[in-house]
């Protein structure tokens, strides 16, 4: 989990940092768990750009991740810890006692040779997956389901974890990484521990080329566009926005306006909204 810097041989190398990937044990993925990934370039079926700033980048193959962890009672041995280009966390290849191989999100502290298991009778040990009803209050967890059996949807990014705060009736109270406090059904599954790659958030990209390798294209400021391209465009030199507040390219209020629907079904499960930045 170390971060490496560089001598300032060029302006872009001055602040650039990279992960040393000390935890990674192999760079050859399991072929049976790879799927071809077709790039959209941000276009829909009609060829129109629906998501800006996407295109190019290094070719990738998708790693099929087991988010359900539904192979109960069968111990699995960690074979490798690997890099996944499709997510910020590292992944672990586990081999079950019956010979089946699966990828899981690797938690901090999981090493090659460790044995993990899923199911209600599992021990409270890093990497084990079990229903929230069987997890003690105060435990650090990740990879959390919102609907039992659907697969993990919450807390999957590098370095994140949630805390189990209480259990009452059919629901458990969780504090999420964003600061949000919400209810989750106690039959939903979660994995013990914190997601791997803790130093991900302090990596400095350093130069535009690394963003291009990731498939992210440049973002042009609206103020340097023409008035027919953006509400901020036009004027002589560095002109002000010309509106009470900043707007999106489509004329909607930007920066600070809440976009969540007022009457969303999940509002009743949220006790406290996420922290303001």
Swiss-Prot record:
It comes from the Bacteria. GO terms for cellular component: large ribosomal subunit. GO terms for biological process: cytoplasmic translation. Pfam families: Ribosomal_L2, Ribosomal_L2_C. Belongs to the universal ribosomal protein uL2 family. The keyword RNA-binding applies. One of the primary rRNA binding proteins. Required for association of the 30S and 50S subunits to form the 70S ribosome, for tRNA binding and peptide bond formation. It has been suggested to have peptidyltransferase activity; this is somewhat controversial. Makes several contacts with the 16S rRNA in the 70S ribosome. This is Large ribosomal subunit protein uL2. Residues 222-277 are annotated as: Disordered.
């Amino acid at each position: 989990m170390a971060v490496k810097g560089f001598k300032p041989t060029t302006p872009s190398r001055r602040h650039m940092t990279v992960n040393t990937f000390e935890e990674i044990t192999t760079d050859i993925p399991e072929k049976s768990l790879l799927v071809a990934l077709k790039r959209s370039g941000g276009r829909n079926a009609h060829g129109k750009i629906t998501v800006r700033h996407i295109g190019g980048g290094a070719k990738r193959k998708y790693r099929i991740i087991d988010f359900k962890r539904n192979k109960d009672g069968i111990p699995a041995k960690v074979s490798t810890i690997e890099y996944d280009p499709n997510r910020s966390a590292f992944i672990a290849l586990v081999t079950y006692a019956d010979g089946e191989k699966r990828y899981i999100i690797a938690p901090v502290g999981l090493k090659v040779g460790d044995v993990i298991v899923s199911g209600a009778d599992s021990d409270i040990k890093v990497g084990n997956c079990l229903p929230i009803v069987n997890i003690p209050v105060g435990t650090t967890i990740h990879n959390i389901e919102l609907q039992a059996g659907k697969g993990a949807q919450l807390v999957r990014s590098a370095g994140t974890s949630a805390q189990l705060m209480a259990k009452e009736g059919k629901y458990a109270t969780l504090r999420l990484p964003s600061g949000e406090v919400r209810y989750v059904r106690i039959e939903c599954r979660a994995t013990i521990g914190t997601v791997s790659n803790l130093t991900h958030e302090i990596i400095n990209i350093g130069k535009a080329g690394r963003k291009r390798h990731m498939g992210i294209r440049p973002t042009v400021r609206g103020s340097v566009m023409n008035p027919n391209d953006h509400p901020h465009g036009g004027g002589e030199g560095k002109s002000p926005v010309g509106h009470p507040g900043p707007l999106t390219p489509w004329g909607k209020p930007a920066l600070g306006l809440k976009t969540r629907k007022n009457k969303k079904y999940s509002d009743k499960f949220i006790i406290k909204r996420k922290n303001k930045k």
